[in-house]
Amino acid sequence: MVSNNMKKVFIDSRSKELTNEEKEKENKNSPNIITSSDYELGFYRNEIDTRRSYITKLLQTKVWTPNMKPKKHNCIIIFDWDDTLLPTSFLTRGGCFYEEMELSSSDEKKILELQDLVLELLNNTIEKGTVYIITNAGMDWVKYSSQRFYPKIIPILEKIKIVSARGEYEKEFPGNSRQWKIEAFLMLQNTVNLKLVTNIICLGDSLFEMEAGRILASRFTEAFIKTIKFREAPKLDELIKQLKLVNKQFNSIYSSIKNLTIRVERKKK
């Protein structure tokens, strides 16, 4: 039983990183890098883009042009919570958060900066489409942790659908956190018109989110899938830099007319 001074949370299970062979394969296909400070966004080309003919048709018939602002309902944006928006690994030890934990004044300032960066990102994304937070944590963790660390974002969270993949699918798939995420993502196809949604953007620190995003995209008649993988278990400074970089480049990612596989990486020295 959890004591009153300790909050039990469930952090997303981590999938293993890409193998060296997979990394080398993707690095050969990397067309460009966008940098900021000591982090960069690595863009990786998909070997097969099944949407090319569709894009060409839209351009030729002038049904859609690169400068045309997509309709709001044509975009789904899915966030992970732990270690993507909230520095959960920093705030917890062994999956447990202690309510009486004390932060240094320096760390408190960094949490406040993170709060502003998360607020900026959520405000931007909610203007562009339907936003979801899908987490493998327990049902109340997003609400509790935002009240504790990010109170400024609470009003905007009320406009966002928050889903606990664990809460929805743990009984059906016990111990299989990968499948929880996939099923929670697929649940979204029941809430939208599969023929209208053309832009799916997935942001998370685990390969689970990236895989689930691609599986969801495959259910749509036509969709562009953009995945943005954050670094796992970031320190406060690291998450600040990652969010700054994504905030800076999000509009370009959103308006891109192709599938994108993006990883936030340290600059190579």
Could you say what each language-model-derived stretch is?
Residues 92-104, 122-126, 160-169, 192-194:
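Surface-exposed beta-strand-to-loop junctions
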Residues 3, 7-12, 33-38, 68, ...:
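C-terminal cap/substrate-recognition subdomain and adjoining C-terminal extension
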Residues 73-75, 129-130, 194-199:
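Short coil/turn segments at beta-strand junctions that form active-site/ligand-binding loops
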